[in-house]
Amino acid sequence: MNSPQNVSTKKVTVTGAAGQISYSLLWRIANGEVFGTDTPVELKLLEIPQALGGAEGVAMELLDSAFPLLRNITITADANEAFDGANAAFLVGAKPRGKGEERADLLANNGKIFGPQGKAINDNAADDIRVLVVGNPANTNALIASAAAPDVPASRFNAMMRLDHNRAISQLATKLGRGSAEFNNIVVWGNHSATQFPDITYATVGGEKVTDLVDHDWYVEEFIPRVANRGAEIIEVRGKSSAASAASSAIDHMRDWVQGTEAWSSAAIPSTGAYGIPEGIFVGLPTVSRNGEWEIVEGLEISDFQRARIDANAQELQAEREAVRDLL
């Protein structure tokens, strides 16, 4: 194993760096959980001007944690500086939906954030940049950012479905009394919204088909809506949105993207037309990670039940795209 002194430092940009998700995320990155425990990291924290004080406090705490792999921290409100030389970026900062605000307005307001950030990535990031959009509405925010970065392959932009994926595993593990690591071949199709389709059609646990172990009515009437609405449930109980679980899922996604995995995951990537899903949207698909790239798990048989739910997600994402067409 190479010592940290002999491995090139990876620059990681985190937007919304003073927020709750980043407060959990940054410690995991600094601890080597994305690039490995032999790879030094430099953190670049992007915030809006009025939140720079909060980001400064976060940086102070990171330094006080004395991570052996943490080489430097930059705090800035300038996107060009934040993405300069970045090898990985977590786009966490987003404008939350205001009371009574229409989804079209939410999309447009976030377009004003993710468009300029996409351009800054295009102009400044390293050639091997990987961008994970966490801030919602994540799928269409990823589309906007990618459209503003024509020199960066669209496959270098992802939106996070891993939280939904992990929630699906958790619900099954609780239902069946099994460990989360025992489950394989779960997928969450579509949009990171209440329309999403957590799918257990191909799932196994300990060599058994999950569909043989759970009741179909429970699957349709409890499991799917519970996973899809878990974020709202946590807000109702906690009084705040999911933060630590979102950060943990973002780490899972980026680690697997960088280091590779043959285990199925769910990632929102640019549609290639696979499974009859139209191109031009970022959609959750069953994936594995090989050679630093996500590959779609192909050849799966799709039932009419699945088809209807996958199509509903594609239509929702196409409608979101139309709402921000002037930004693309």
UniProtKB/Swiss-Prot annotation:
NAD(+) binds at G16, A17, A18, G19, Q20, I21, S22, N110, Q117, V134, G135, N136. The active site is at H192. Citrate activates the enzyme in the oxidation of malate to oxaloacetate and inhibits it in the reverse reaction. It catalyses: (S)-malate + NAD(+) = oxaloacetate + NADH + H(+). Keywords: NAD, Oxidoreductase, Tricarboxylic acid cycle. Gene3D superfamilies: Lactate dehydrogenase/glycoside hydrolase, family 4, C-terminal, NAD(P)-binding Rossmann-like Domain. InterPro entries: L-lactate/malate_DH (IPR001557), Lactate/malate_DH_C (IPR022383), Lactate/malate_DH_N (IPR001236), Lactate_DH/Glyco_Ohase_4_C (IPR015955), Malate_DH_type2 (IPR010945), NAD(P)-bd_dom_sf (IPR036291). It comes from the Bacteria. HAMAP family: Malate_dehydrog_2. This is Malate dehydrogenase. The gene is mdh.
